[in-house]
Design a protein with these regions (language model features):
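Conserved P-loop
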Residues: 1-76, 81-86
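Short amphipathic alpha-helical segments
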Residues: 14, 88-89, 146-147
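Loop/turn-to-beta-strand initiation segments
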Residues: 71-74, 127-134
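Conserved P-loop NTPase nucleotide-binding/switch module
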Residues: 77-107, 150-154
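A short acidic, glycine-rich active-site loop
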Residues: 99-116, 173-176
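Catalytic-core regions built around general acid/base machinery
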Residues: 113-129
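Phosphate-binding/switch region of NTP-binding enzymes
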Residues: 130-228
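NTP-binding/hydrolysis catalytic cores, primarily Walker-type P-loop NTPases
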Residues: 215-249
């Protein structure tokens, strides 16, 4: 049972009889495009209260009372990247001094809410015996080396810019703003990455379950050193199934 925040599952027209989808219908903003443009240019927060994060929270609370959710063995959230877009706008609106962009204090609220809501979601799934799948988009992340210096200086417009002097490590991280990007994967037992290989001129999707030097992927499933699989949990978890059956037998 998926909470579809990206609103792409149903539009794909896939015939998935074993999958139920609950779509988040709320837009990122309740303001008109003209109002939002003016507010963004003037560095002002949203005029009307965004509804997306509040609706998502209500949907999560409703899961144990929702028939199709309780009949499913797995709950899914697709995706955390779009979810934080809703949360960010809610924070800006609720801040009495809010502007069009997050302040350092707002980033603290963003981190705290993502930490707490993720932990609550995981606990809720465990309490009801459900597996949990959370998807997130990726972005390139630059991490300063141990001897890299950070210099903050103002540009011609008076805005503070950060300049890094030294080596930078290129990583692929969850596409989440702020510090939670580096913490998100630590909340989950397994962390997989989807990628595409070109085979005979055709795209073939693969699922990587082991680190590749840039992504902090991992699995506790016995995979005998195999790093890439078809994007099918039945293939990845064969070793886990065999081990479990052996222990029970």
């Amino acid at each position: 049972h998926f909470i579809d925040i990206d609103r792409k599952v149903l539009s794909c027209g896939l015939n998935l009889p074993d999958v139920t989808v609950w779509e988040l219908a709320e837009a990122l903003t309740e303001d008109s495009m003209a109002e939002r443009l003016r507010a963004l240019v003037d560095n002002k927060k949203p005029k009307s209260a965004p509804q997306g994060w509040s609706k998502y929270s209500a949907m999560v609370d409703e899961l144990p009372r929702r028939k199709e959710a309780m009949e499913a063995g797995t709950w899914g959230i697709d995706s955390y990247t779009r979810l934080q877009d809703h949360l960010k706008r809610q924070i800006l609106y609720l801040d009495a001094k809010g502007a069009s962009n997050l302040s350092p204090r707002n980033y603290g609220a963003l981190l705290g809410m993502l930490e707490e809501s993720t932990a609550q979601l995981i606990d809720l799934a465990k309490a009801h015996g459900k597996d949990l799948i959370v998807t997130v988009h990726e972005r390139v992340s630059e991490i300063p080396g141990p001897n890299t210096r950070v210099i903050n200086q103002r540009n011609a417009q008076g805005e503070v810019e950060r300049e890094f002097i030294g080596e930078m490590q290129i990583r692929i991280a969850p596409s989440i703003e702020g510090q939670f990007s580096g913490k998100m994967l630590s909340y989950f037992d397994e962390a997989y990455g989807l990628h595409v290989d070109m085979v005979d001129g055709k795209p073939v999707w693969r699922c990587r379950v082991m680190p590749d030097g840039r992504r902090d992927l991992r699995t506790a499933i016995p995979v005998n050193g195999v790093a890439d699989f078809p994007p099918d949990f039945r293939e990845i978890w064969k070793g886990h199934t065999t081990t479990t059956q052996t222990k029970k037998g």
